[in-house]
Structures are given as structure tokens and as C-alpha cells.
Amino acid sequence: DRRVNLLYSALEGKIMRIFPIPEDSNNKWVSYPEVNDVEFSGADSLYVNNVLQLYFQTLRVSRESNNYSQSEELLESIKGYQVKYGSDVLPSDLKISSEIIYNKVDIFNRLYKWYLLFGFSLLLILILQIFNDKKFYNILIKFIEYTIYFLFILNTIGLAARWYIAGHAPWSDAYESIIFVAWATVIFGIIFGRKSYFTLASATLVSSIILSVAHMNWLDPSIANLQPVLDSYWLMIHVAVIAVSY
């Protein structure tokens, strides 16, 4: 139902909130279908009511002539309008680029497959080693161990990237809480895995299961604004401690 509503909003154009309301105390932005619900003044009203139509018209012409200069000028014009009235909440170019890379890499969706592969491989080799202790097994175990360390570093970078892009700690909703618990599971597996590789293998497998749950259809992985009720430094610490303790 949520995805159907999201698709419907996208088709209507309501999802593209590209026009900041001038001097709005809450820094609200509106989409083109919502423009008539807001009182824009003078030239601003004329601009927001016509710029998108002009842009789509130039796109059709540009497609035939293969010259997109007019379309690019209008895009720069829209960006200038956003900077003029919405600079307080407009993300930097670096943050925009970071989010694009983050979405393309899709690190957490890939990680659970790698965690599953190497966690299960480590567990299988450890079981085989009980019956036949060969030097070759020790080499494989060390290789898998350092590979898991590398995957954990990627996991940490993914969380840090999400923190940077969102502007708040990555455990503010169901999806973020689950991927954070998966990260904590691996770090404790690494700490206690020094005494037993079975601990590291088990923690990696559990983390894989947790991450796979995070990517089920009923969880939304999108990066969203923090809800006002959660906008508390101490609450973020409290949630982190409780989540990790599980």
C-alpha cells in the first residue's frame, strides 16, 4: 500500500518538492501541483507556475535537436531559485554526490550476502578442522577472518555515510535500527572471536540474517528527515545503548 501511494505521488508530481516557499519559518518546500495552495508573490508566482512547463517543452525540442543548452539553463535557474529562498536547508553538492553514490552502491543489501557466504564458509571449515587439522585450513581461516574485518569496515563506512547524509545518528527508524544492530553484532563477534573463531562465524551469520530482514519489503530504507520527537541528543544515546545491548 505504501509503495502504491508512493508511485501515485510520483506520477502526480507531488513527490518532487523543488520550490522553497520564500521566508517560510519552517523552510517548507512544495511540488508543482501544490504551488496553487501557497501564496507566492509577484514574479515568484509567475516563475513557479511556468518554469516546469517551459522546462518540459525545451526537453522535447532538445531531444529532436540534440541541443540541451536551454534545458540546462532552466535547470540552473531552478537551482538559483532554490539557493535564494532555501539555502538554509539545501544540501551541499558534496552531500548530494554522497547520497547518489550511497544509493548506487547499496552497501547493506550487498553486505548480508557476503556476510552469509564468509560466515558459513568459516563455520564449515572450523567443523572440518575438528576432524582433520590441516595447515591449509588455518590459512583459509585467516583469509576469511581478515575478509570479515574488511566487510566490517565497509559496514562502518556505510553507517557513517548514512549519518553524514541524514545529518543524524543512523538509528532513528526501523530500518536504521536493524542495520545498526547488525553492525554491533559483528563488532562484538570480532571482539570475542579472538578466543574462538566459532564466535566470529556465528556473529557474522547472525548479522547476515539481521541485514536480510532489514531488506524485506515492509521496511523503508530511504533516508528521511528526523521526526521532531526523536530530535534529542540524549534520546539518540539511549536508543543506541538499548539497541546494542540486545
Regions found by a protein language model. Name each.
Residues 1-101:
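Soluble extramembrane regions of membrane proteins in the secretory/endomembrane system
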Residues 78, 173, 238:
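Conserved hydrophobic/aromatic pocket- or pore-lining residues that grip, position, or stack substrates
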